[in-house]
Regions:
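Metallocofactor- and cofactor-centric catalytic cores in central/energy metabolism, strongly enriched
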Residues: 1-313
């Protein structure tokens, strides 16, 4: 019933999809799709990029406005798909695991193959210092630890407090980075090298019936051809998690998936449907109908009845 549908942990069984295993983990017949090629940029480290962009990565949120101004002011040269600032509110006043997680995510952005060149923008007083961050970027680059932290002109580091005119210096750096990247050319690469990121479909009334099903079939076609697909927003997997678990390549991956689901979906401070209604649904309804007191009272009364001791099947 609705009262006991969710608990602190959920139990799952490792029942591999025999059809998928027998096919060598090809969920669908590819019918030659695996032989197709795409046009992409081959990076010096061997990775492929779909776009040839210049990225501005702030080490700290304090320079977000500077990053945005530089991205909006710089003139995009021929051969460059765009200049983008990846702003965020982090990089300072963080400690321990939170601080390291921020640094790791930002370093991986700098090393992303869609970024033909990168301007790393720091302030100077943040605890994610430009100097230490450059070392992390080098250690996490595909070339491995000890590689040139400027990656032969691909990365420029700018600390705004060390500059008398950070706008002029930033624009000059972006100009150099574009000169470095504008001669990159697309070439034919195998579809198997493609990495696709999935995004939430909006969670409307039809996404689980139409859009998600179609996207799933597309993912099957690509992964069966050797491509990689990354699923995001783990709570959206709720209800289909056992199906995904049945595709785990081994018991170890299955166990990690179960832990992920239990940690991010079920194992929260709100662990029953009644509590979800009380602490999540009701506030949302109140937000949208608070201007209509009569309608609000009717909704609240209905939900109060719904979350009573009565079982709902």
């Amino acid at each position: 019933n609705m009262k006991t549908l969710l608990s602190e942990t959920a139990e799952y069984s490792y029942t591999p999809d025999e059809k998928v295993i027998a096919s060598g983990y090809k969920a669908v017949e590819t019918n030659g799709f695996e032989n197709k090629t795409i046009k992409a940029y081959r990076r010096p480290n061997g990775k492929i990029g779909i776009r040839n962009e210049i990225w501005i990565v702030p080490t700290v949120g304090c320079v977000n406005k500077l990053a945005e101004r530089l991205a909006n002011t710089a003139k995009v040269k021929d051969g460059i798909d765009g200049i983008h600032a990846w702003i965020h509110p982090y990089g300072c006043s963080q400690m321990g695991g939170d601080h390291e997680q921020t640094r790791t995510v930002l370093a991986d952005l700098v090393n992303h193959p869609n970024a033909a060149a990168v301007l790393v923008l720091g302030l100077g007083c943040e605890n994610n210092t430009v100097e230490k961050f450059a070392e992390l970027v080098a250690s996490r680059s595909p070339e491995g630890e000890g590689s040139d932290i400027t990656q032969k002109g691909r990365i420029i580091y700018l600390t705004s407090q060390n500059s008398t005119d950070e706008i002029a210096d930033g624009l000059a750096a972006l100009d150099k980075l574009q000169d470095f990247a504008c001669n990159n050319k697309r070439e034919d690469v195998s579809i198997s090298e493609l990495v696709i990121g999935m995004k939430c479909g909006g969670s409307d009334g039809l996404s689980g019936i139409t859009a998600n099903a179609l996207v799933g079939q597309i993912c099957d076609r690509f992964t069966s051809s050797g491509s990689k697909v990354m699923l995001t927003e783990v709570p959206e997997m709720f209800g289909a998690e056992q199906m995904l678990m049945n595709r785990c390549i081994n018991k170890s991956i299955f166990d990690k998936t179960v832990d992920l689901i239990n940690k991010l979906i079920v194992g929260t401070s709100i662990d029953t449907v009644s509590e979800v209604l009380e602490y999540q649904v009701k506030p949302i309804i109140a937000q949208y109908v608070k201007q209509h007191e009569v309608l609000y009272n009717a909704f609240y009364s209905a939900l109060s009845n719904f979350t009573s001791e009565r079982d709902v099947k």
